[in-house]
Each structure stands twice: as structure tokens, then as C-alpha cells.
Regions:
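Short acidic/polar hinge/loop motifs at secondary-structure boundaries
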Residues: 47-50, 181-210
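Extracytoplasmic beta-strand/coil segments of soluble accessory domains associated
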Residues: 134-181, 205, 215-232
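Outer-membrane beta-barrel transmembrane domain signature of Gram-negative proteins
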Residues: 254-270, 349-372, 406-493, 524, ...
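Conserved C-terminal beta-signal and adjacent last beta-strands/turns
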Residues: 268-270, 284, 309, 530-531, ...
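Flexible loop and strand-edge segments within Gram-negative outer membrane beta-barrel domains
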Residues: 276, 288-297, 301-375, 382-383, ...
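Gram-negative outer-membrane beta-barrel transporters
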Residues: 596, 618-716
Length: 800
């Protein structure tokens, strides 16, 4: 007797995804609902989903940022491939967009109780972008960055709600991730930059989460928010795509009374196997002349990246690596102060201002990698593992013709391990639950060796140094987190979360810390308007003191006496807000926030002994900081014109401080209710983007013209010129660092940027980018590093 077994053969579903103007949408997600099957579109808008079980009914959906999700019903039949094409209508209703910044796991934006800003690949693709901080400045309410002071410089201090990823601000940190891996930050005395090793052309999207209410699951050093950068994967189509960019840069250098010239070249190649694997590789090289008198060396940078993405059964494996090299000479950043020396009679100015520039320079190498593995048990249950490393090696060599050499080398390493699982379940016709739980661990170390020697060598050993100094420090953070979202009829979302963590910094155990979180969002409709009301409360992780703050150190000009009794910074806060959607083409976001910071850490030079050559200082805890404000954002489309704007009001003041508020020495600086220095009272941005259509069959892509106007409001600060008058002009009495006579208000200013990009053919485009048209120079924070003047960049983009 023969037994016949029939096994149905799977089928293939393919098609294209375009917008309502007929243009392909690159990176759109197409998926079969209720399954783990899906794919992303390539540069032609094409997708393919293979090995789909036959003889079944499915709902297939296409989703793309800035467009309305579309779903279709299909039936598969053995031996018959299916073609399903989608045309997505542009829409500002983004409630179904998936974000991961708040909870690590994927969750729709409608369930988020805190505001999340998403910057899509489309935003980055249609206009020339130099660095990521420029994008964030215009797109994120309450966010801004200081203007760069050197060519090619990416700001390491992008500010959110008055807190910053930079140093010197007692308002916590912004934690930055790339593909799930935490970057080195100021907790390790490293300057992370926002994109000093990532080419903006390699970015797929950026998610920004503001404040402690949404960042509690991320633990320490994330008090002010999260910036999560996702880089591109390859295309699973069998096409190989090559991109080239050539750019020329001209930067005004007022100090030199000349222009600084630069050039940039970018190459990338992506492709893969349509069924299971893809790759993406590329590099970016830039050379810029200095804008200040230097020792003849340019600023050189090289960035290289690579990624491989593979699908094996129900698991997706994504491996990425990046490498960055850079070098530059020494500049005289005191050069323009010589003008003040003459004009303001600074006859007591330090003699070293007139010293000739030293030979040598600085160089760095920054490698990193990430491994992301996602495995689906069912369509509603998956696990994820992230393993990665961010490193940096820095070398400083400085020597004069008739004296010895100064030498400094620093090595940083940070390893990240994050494992979680995500589970969803429908428990009744009205209720759904969404649970994420996991563990995260980071291990960081920093080794610093400095000294001087008499002779110049290519390789140095410990015994070569005359006055060697070695610092070896390590940090560890271990956290366990969980978050539950209860959904009632897809309208009411209740979020409950908690992180429990331990921190050990430079050998000191800061114990166990708990970070709870509560959130609520409610969706309603009035006529044609959708309203999302939201409220959130959270207590962020601690910010332990940095080694440079707690431990003593000494430089050529100053002495830090150290303060081992520093307490970690803490933060909590709440926010209330609403998102209003008027049809597909108008959106308004309003948020009020109230955040309390405790034990902020800041530099205190008031202990300086004026009779000694070197300046003495230490770091202290500064009591309470109360940070309140409003954030407003709006977007609309009027024909081919896209308009977006945001405006933030920031009221950052000192609260209770028993240490300083009873001391008349600090009057005007730390009084209860007094505004903090260097925090603008308001920020804003207006962006107008006109989409230019293609004018011939050879140029269907068209292009864009954008005008960006950024506004920084009035801010309180020190009159640095008056302070130096007191130090260097013998006819002016010296001022203490905290003299209230130094206080002033810096006027508001605007920064204007014009960008243009047009595809002459479907394979070639030209672009022009003019930054800082108003030629504003901001000296409110440091008169030795004024902002750059007008910067012009022009070039050519090719796709092959």
C-alpha cells in the first residue's frame, strides 16, 4: 500500500510602493499582518516577500514615515506568485509610526505618553546635510546647538530643554545611541560628538526623546533625553547601487581676513540577495583649511562604514562596523585676543599669548561595531540581543624647536550588552497588553598617559618621560527594566515602567537606584480632528560624578583639588501635552514640562588663591534647579510647500541651595528663583521647503529649496571682556568670578540657512548649502572660540 503526502509550496509576493505623485518610496515597510513576514523597499520602491504559505488569506500593509498606512486583502494560491502594488498618500498623521527610543522595543507612536521626534530618511535624503546636529537643531522642539567654531566640526553639545550632552552644564546628559549601542560620553571625559564618525548619508532615521519622563528605562546619564540614530541596511534586491558625492566648501575666516577652503568626497555601495541577505559599505573623506592661524596642517577626516544584514528563518541578524580617523595641527585660538590686548590696554596679559605656535598636532582613531539579533517566536512575541562597542584613541604631540615635547595619549572603550523580549496579547475584545522586559549592561574604561621628554621619537616608552602621569579609570552600569502598556480599545494607553540599576564609577559603588515611570495617552476625534492627549511622570537615572570632578588633577595653568564627597545628580519631572491632527496636512504639538534637578555638579573657581600662579578650583553640588517650559511644534503642507516650525519657552531657575544662597559672594548667580546663566529664555525654528518638480522624462525626481531660520532668545551670562579687563588692564579693578557686576544679558539672534538640491537627471543631482547667512558670531560662552562666519558648500551627487 502506498501513502501519498502532499505539501503545499510557498509563494512569493512582490510589488512596488510609490507616493501619490508616482515617485518610489525608498525604505517603506511592507508586511503581512499577524505574521513575522515582511520586507523593505529598495531604491526603486520594489519589495519582495518570499516563502509565504499558500492557500491562505492575509492582510498586507505598507507603511512609510509621513504617509498614510494602506492595507489590502489577498489570498495565496499554490504555484501562483502575487503582485501587490501600493500608492501611499502623504499624511502628517503619524500615530501608527513605530518608535523604539523610549522602550527599546517596537511600539506605535500612539501609545507613547512622551513626545517623540522622528527624522526620516526622506528628510535627510532630499536636502544636503552636513552633520546630524544641524538636522536636530531645526526639527526638535527645545533643542539647539552652538554654532561650530572650526570647519568640519560637529557639535558635541546638542541641548535639550536646557540639559546637554556637553560638559559644564549641571543639567544631566543626553544619551546617544547608534543602532542600539551607547556611545562614549562625558561620563568618561570623552567628547562624543553627534556625528564625528557617522556620515549623514548613512543615516536611515533618528528618534529623539526629550526629558526624564520618557528616558527612565535607559538609566544613568540619560536625564535630559535620548538620541537614537539608526544607520542604513543594504537592499535585498539583486541590484547594486553606487552613490558618489563631491563637494567644495568655502568658509569665511574673519580672523584671517580670508576664506578657508575645504573639500569632501563620499562613496557608498549597497545591494544583496533578494531572499535573505544585504550589504552596505562606504566612506567619507574631508579636508578643511583652518580658520585661525595655525602651524600649517589642515583638518583631515576619514570615515568608513560597513554592514551585513541577513534573515535566517524567523531571525534577523544585523552586523555593522564603523571606523573614523582624523588629524589636525595646532591653532592660535588666542590670536584675535591680541586685538583686544591693544584696544583695551591689556598690558598684564599672559606672556604665552605671544608665543610662537608649536609643531605637532593631534590625531584620533575611532572604531566601533554593533551586532543586533532579533528572533521571533510568534507574530506577537520576539526577543532581541544587542552587543556593541564604541572606542576612541587620541594622541597629542606638541613640541618647540628649543625645548622638550609634550605628549598625551588617551584610550576609551565602552561595551554595551542589551537583551530584552517583547510580548503582546489580546486579553479581551477591549483590552490588549504590551510588555517589554530586559537587562542592559555597559562597561567603560579610560586610560590617560601624559608627560614630557627631551627628544623626539616615533615610539615612546614609560621610562622616556620626565614627569609621567597615568590615570586608569573604569565605570560599570547594570540595569534591569520592564514596561507594561495596557491598551483599551486602541484609544486609551496606560504605561507603567521601572528600571533598577547599580553604578560603579572609578571604584566607588553608588548603590542601587530605582527609576519609575508612568504615562497615559488618550485618543479622541472631534469632527475631522484627531486629538492625542498625553501625560507622563518619571524619575530619571542618576548621573554619578565624573573622575575629573571627584579626583584631583593639575595642568600647566590650573589645579583641580578634587572633591570625593560629590553626590550624583538626580532628576524627576512631569509633562502634559496634546497632539492635534487636522486632516492629513496640518499637525500641532503642545507640551508643558516641569523638571526638578537635584545636586547638579559644576565647576567652582571661587576658591582660587590670587597669589598663586595657577588657578585653583573644584567641583561642588549646587542644590536644586527647576526647569519649566512650553514646547510648540507645527507642520503643514500647502501644495508643493512644506512648512514646519517650533518654538520653545524655557524657564530654568535655581531652587533651594543652602550652600550658596546665604553667602553674599554669590549674589545674583544662585539666588532662589534666579535664572541660570547661558540658558536661552526661548528657541525657535522656521523651515520652508519648496518641492521643485522634474521638468523632463530624464529628471522625474525634481528637487527641493529650503530656507531655515533658527532663533536663540535672550540669555543671561558673564561679560567676559569686562572680566578680562579686570585681570589684564592695570587701570581696572579685578572682578571675582562671581561678581554680580559681570552679569549681562546677551541679545537674541537669528541664524539663516539656505539649501538647494535638484536632480538634473534621475542619476545626478547638484546641491548648494549656505549656512549662517547672517554671519552671527556668538561669544557668550567663550570669547576665544567665536563661531564661524558664512559657510558655503556646493557639489554633485551621483547614483549608479
Amino acid at each position: 500500500m502506498a501513502v501519498s503526502i502532499s505539501v503545499s509550496q510557498p509563494v512569493t509576493i512582490s510589488g512596488t510602493v510609490i507616493n501619490d505623485k508616482g515617485k518610489p518610496l525608498v525604505g517603506a515597510n511592507v508586511f503581512l499582518e499577524g505574521t513575522v513576514l515582511g520586507a523593505a523597499t529598495d531604491l526603486s520602491g520594489y519589495y519582495i516577500i518570499e516563502r509565504v504559505p499558500s492557500d491562505r488569506f492575509y492582510k498586507i500593509s505598507a507603511r512609510y514615515i509621513g504617509h498614510r498606512m494602506t492595507t489590502k486583502d489577498i489570498a495565496t494560491e499554490e504555484g501562483k506568485p502575487i503582485t501587490v502594488d501600493f500608492e501611499l498618500v502623504m499624511s502628517l498623521v503619524d500615530l501608527d509610526e513605530v518608535v523604539v527610543a523610549a522602550s527599546f522595543s517596537e511600539r506605535k507612536k500612539r501609545a507613547q505618553a512622551s513626545p517623540v521626534t522622528i527624522i526620516s530618511q526622506d528628510d535627510l535624503r532630499r536636502l544636503p546635510v552636513r552633520s546630524i546636529d544641524e538636522v536636530l537643531t531645526g526639527k526638535v522642539p527645545g533643542g539647539y546647538a552652538n554654532l561650530p567654531s572650526r570647519p568640519g566640526q560637529n557639535n558635541s553639545a546638542f541641548t535639550l530643554r536646557g540639559g546637554t550632552s556637553g560638559s559644564g552644564r549641571p543639567l544631566g546628559d543626553v544619551k546617544i545611541y547608534i543602532d542600539g549601542v551607547e556611545l562614549l560620553g562625558f561620563d568618561m571625559q570623552s567628547y562624543p560628538g553627534i556625528a564625528d564618525f557617522i556620515d549623514p548619508d548613512d543615516i536611515e532615521k533618528i528618534e529623539v526623546l526629550r526629558g526624564p519622563m520618557g528616558s527612565t528605562l535607559h538609566g544613568s546619564n540619560a536625564q535630559s533625553g535620548i538620541i537614537h540614530i539608526f544607520t542604513k541596511k543594504g537592499s535585498r534586491s539583486r541590484k547594486t547601487v553606487i552613490k558618489l558625492k563631491f563637494a567644495r566648501k568655502i568658509t569665511q575666516a574673519p580672523i584671517l581676513d580670508d576664506d578657508a577652503i575645504g573639500q569632501e568626497t563620499t562613496f557608498s555601495m549597497s545591494g544583496g540577495n533578494s531572499s535573505s541577505a544585504s550589504y552596505n559599505i562606504g566612506f567619507n573623506n574631508s579636508i578643511d583649511q583652518e580658520v585661525m592661524p595655525g602651524n600649517g596642517r589642515d583638518i583631515e577626516r576619514l570615515k568608513v562604514h560597513g554592514s551585513v544584514n541577513a534573515k535566517i528563518g524567523t531571525a534577523v541578524i544585523d552586523i555593522k562596523t564603523y571606523h573614523s580617523w582624523g588629524q589636525q595641527g595646532f591653532i592660535s585660538n588666542l590670536y584675535h585676543l591680541l586685538e583686544y590686548k591693544e584696544d583695551r590696554s591689556w598690558t598684564n596679559a599672559p606672556e604665552h599669548w605671544d608665543d610662537s605656535l608649536a609643531s605637532g598636532g593631534t590625531s584620533y582613531y575611532k572604531p566601533g561595531f554593533s551586532l543586533n539579533i532579533t528572533h521571533s517566536f510568534t507574530q506577537d512575541w520576539y526577543q532581541s540581543l544587542v552587543i556593541g562597542n564604541d572606542s576612541k584613541k587620541f594622541l597629542y604631540k606638541k613640541y618647540y624647536a628649543n625645548s622638550g615635547q609634550g605628549y598625551l595619549t588617551e584610550d576609551w572603550n565602552r561595551y554595551t550588552l542589551n537583551y530584552f523580549w517583547h510580548y503582546k496579547k489580546k486579553i479581551s475584545n477591549s483590552f490588549n497588553i504590551d510588555l517589554t522586559t530586559g537587562t542592559q549592561r555597559t562597561m567603560s574604561n579610560h586610560v590617560r598617559l601624559s608627560g614630557s621628554m627631551d627628544e623626539r621619537k616615533d615610539q615612546y616608552y614609560y621610562e622616556d618621560f620626565d614627569d609621567v602621569s597615568i590615570v586608569d579609570q573604569s565605570n560599570q552600569n547594570s540595569g534591569y527594566y520592564g514596561e507594561l502598556v495596557v491598551d483599551y480599545k486602541d484609544r486609551i494607553y496606560l504605561t507603567i515602567g521601572e528600571r533598577v540599576e547599580q553604578n560603579e564609577y572609578f571604584g566607588k559603588d553608588y548603590g542601587t537606584h530605582y527609576s519609575p515611570r508612568l504615562g497615559l495617552s488618550y485618543l479622541s476625534e472631534i469632527g475631522g480632528m484627531i486629538i492625542k492627549s498625553r501625560a507622563a511622570w518619571g524619575s530619571g537615572g542618576i548621573n554619578p560624578p565624573k573622575a575629573m570632578q571627584a579626583l584631583p588633577s593639575e595642568s600647566n595653568y590650573s589645579i583641580n583639588i578634587g572633591n570625593p564627597d560629590l553626590r550624583p545628580e538626580r532628576q524627576s519631572g512631569y509633562e502634559l501635552g496634546g497632539d492635534f491632527y487636522f486632516g492629513d496636512n496640518f499637525f500641532v504639538e503642545v507640551t508643558y514640562f516641569d523638571q526638578l534637578f537635584l545636586d547638579g555638579i559644576a565647576n567652582d573657581p571661587s576658591i582660587d588663591d590670587l597669589q598663586t600662579i595657577k588657578q585653583e578650583y573644584w567641583y561642588i553640588n549646587l542644590g536644586q534647579i527647576i526647569n519649566k517650559g512650553w514646547e510648540l511644534a507645527a507642520k503643514t503642507r500647502v501644495g508643493p510647500l512644506d512648512i514646519s516650525a517650533n518654538y520653545s519657552i524655557l524657564d530654568s531657575r535655581w531652587g533651594e541651595d543652602s550652600l550658596r544662597q546665604n553667602d553674599p559672594v554669590y549674589e545674583g548667580f544662585f539666588d532662589k528663583g534666579t535664572r541660570r546663566n547661558d540658558v536661552p529664555s526661548s528657541t525657535g525654528n522656521l523651515s520652508l521647503v519648496y518641492n521643485v518638480p522634474g521638468f523632463s522624462p530624464k529628471s522625474t525626481k525634481g528637487g527641493s529649496v529650503a530656507l531655515d531660520i533658527s532663533y536663540i532668545g535672550k540669555k543671561k551670562g558673564r561679560d567676559w571682556l569686562l572680566y578680562y579687563d579686570g585681570q589684564y588692564n592695570p587701570d581696572v579693578s579685578p572682578f571675582s568670578y562671581y561678581s554680580k557686576d559681570l552679569l549681562m544679558h546677551y541679545k537674541p539672534f537669528n541664524s539663516v540657512r539656505l539649501r538647494f538640491k535638484y536632480w538634473v537627471t534621475n542619476k545626478a543631482s547638484v546641491f548648494l548649502d549656505i549656512r549662517n547667512l547672517t554671519e552671527h558670531t556668538d561669544i557668550s560662552r567663550s570669547i576665544i572660540e567665536p563661531a564661524l562666519g558664512k559657510q558655503v558648500m556646493m557639489g554633485l551627487d551621483l547614483e549608479i
